[in-house]
Swiss-Prot record:
Zinc finger (B box-type) residue numbers: 8-50, 51-93
Annotated organism of origin: Arabidopsis thaliana
UniProt keyword terms in alphabetical order: Metal-binding, Nucleus, Repeat, Zinc, Zinc-finger
Main location: nucleus
GO CC, one annotated term: nucleus
Binding site for Zn(2+) 2: 51, 54, 74, 79
Top-level taxon of the source organism: Eukaryota
Protein name stated in the entry: Zinc finger protein CONSTANS-LIKE 3
Upper classification of the organism: Eukaryota, Viridiplantae, Streptophyta, Embryophyta, Tracheophyta
InterPro entries: CCT_domain (IPR010402), CONSTANS-like (IPR045281), CONSTANS-like_Bbox1 (IPR049808), Znf_B-box (IPR000315)
Amino acid sequence: MASSSRLCDSCKSTAATLFCRADAAFLCGDCDGKIHTANKLASRHERVWLCEVCEQAPAHVTCKADAAALCVTCDRDIHSANPLSRRHERVPITPFYDAVGPAKSASSSVNFVDEDGGDVTASWLLAKEGIEITNLFSDLDYPKIEVTSEENSSGNDGVVPVQNKLFLNEDYFNFDLSASKISQQGFNFINQTVSTRTIDVPLVPESGGVTAEMTNTETPAVQLSPAEREARVLRYREKRKNRKFEKTIRYASRKAYAEMRPRIKGRFAKRTDSRENDGGDVGVYGGFGVVPSF
């Protein structure tokens, strides 16, 4: 609250709470009711609340984060203080036309009404005392759910625990949000009756009825006796002793074929290329076949 509030331009004795744009006058609640209810023309004057910070100028915007009406100067000073305040959402102030009483203030009238007329500040997440939610889904048709299972051929070897009939009560949403402790009975909205003889729907497939068992698939560690370990070490040492580091030819036929192939500058070449590089008279006798001589 500012140290010195602006006085009403009409009575000069009470702090002004709003500003009339048509009359360009700062008025208190009593004077506003007297002036703007005198005739129909005066009732159409636009009025806005004063700034809630300085209380010296008409409000220009409404800050949704602070829920406060601010003038141009206070809006600039407050929302330029730090980066967090710069992200506050502000909307232009909405003028009103109804006369207000002396008890009504700007903080009580700051509301964020969307285009559909819904009150955003009255959040549905905040519960008020005395509110009782009775059957939120009363407009929907919920048939009774009956979950049953059939015993398999082996008797009582069912995998799924038997919870057979689930009936939804109509009034299971009757709970008081203002209660300090939620009783355990508030959650007993499902009437469960366990019966293994009134079973209609099989929970376990009839073909096979195989139960899934969790087995340990890890490979067990091989435990060797000292004698077995000593034998393995000896075999390894014998193999290492007989190792030969000489060059071995794996494919002798490939090596022989590679030695027979013609080469040009160390690279394999086709036989036609080798004939041209031999300097033979290929141009004259190129079209004639070579007759082998015996």
